[in-house]
Amino acid sequence: MSSFDRRIEAACKFDDERYYKQYHRYFDVLAQVHSVVETINGAQMLRVWRGRKFGPGASAERRERRLFHVTQDSFKRYIVPPNPRIGKAIEENGKELLIEIDVYDDHRDGLKNLNSGDFVAIQNVHAASTRQTEMQVLHGGGASYQRGITTVPVDFEHEAFQNFKKKVEAVLETVAYDENFTEFQQPEEVAENHVDEEPQEEALPRGVVLRTETCDFMDMELDNWPEGPPKTFAEAIARANNSRRPRDPPQ
């Protein structure tokens, strides 16, 4: 058996029902590429799916609350955009179908050569965690640590691979193709569509005494204004500068 065959063989053994049990462990996985994304923090995320949700069900909600998923707020750009049908499948069934892998160092070199819809065998993915979040990581080091991303030809003659491929394709056949599918907006588009709220002036609290550079020796106590106390700092300063009501300088 060749090294290529061994990589595919190991990835085909991935157990969907034990995914949420992969905590601080390393695993191989066979999957289909959804997309590759660069985040605003510079991470490069290989996003893949297997056509179904993961288990065990009792752990799903708790683990998903902590697992990192790319959002509009963290999205910077697509390195590889999603195929509209695959993107729609995730939109309809939920992001919990995605495995999103933070790819490091030399493994990044080949990401731009992937296409959404490619089948890949990924070796030695690390189910890592911090205090705030959990995420899947493909560390650097390349083949010396038996880590890597291997593209699997669609006609590869391996029974387990072909069965997996058919299952994913069967799910996609149930999804309507939408050529206008959009998952994320580019950050500049978000900025263009953002409507700024009217700025709110800071309210002027009662009992505050203001002094301005243009009104020497002036104290403005809010209750002493003939036309009523000003409502904001800007109004108070404008009215003070216009009135110029000096008080006697201190003796």
UniProtKB/Swiss-Prot annotation:
GO terms for molecular function: G-rich strand telomeric DNA binding; single-stranded telomeric DNA binding. Its main location: nucleus. GO terms for cellular component: chromosome, telomeric region; nucleus. Coiled coil: none annotated. Residues 221-251 are annotated as: Disordered. One of its GO terms (biological process) is telomere maintenance. InterPro entries: NA-bd_OB-fold, POT1PC. Keywords: Chromosome, DNA-binding, Nucleus, Telomere. It is found in: Nucleus; Chromosome, Telomere. Belongs to the telombin family. Telomeric DNA-binding protein, which binds to two or more single-stranded G-rich repeat sequences (G-strand), with high specificity to the 5'-TTAGGC-3' sequence. In addition, repeat sequence binding requires a 3' single-stranded telomeric overhang. Acts redundantly with pot-1 to negatively regulate telomerase-mediated telomere extension. Also regulates telomere length by the telomerase-independent telomere maintenance pathway called ALT (alternative lengthening of telomeres). Does not appear to have a role in anchoring telomeres to the nuclear envelope. This is Protection of telomeres homolog 2. The gene is pot-2.
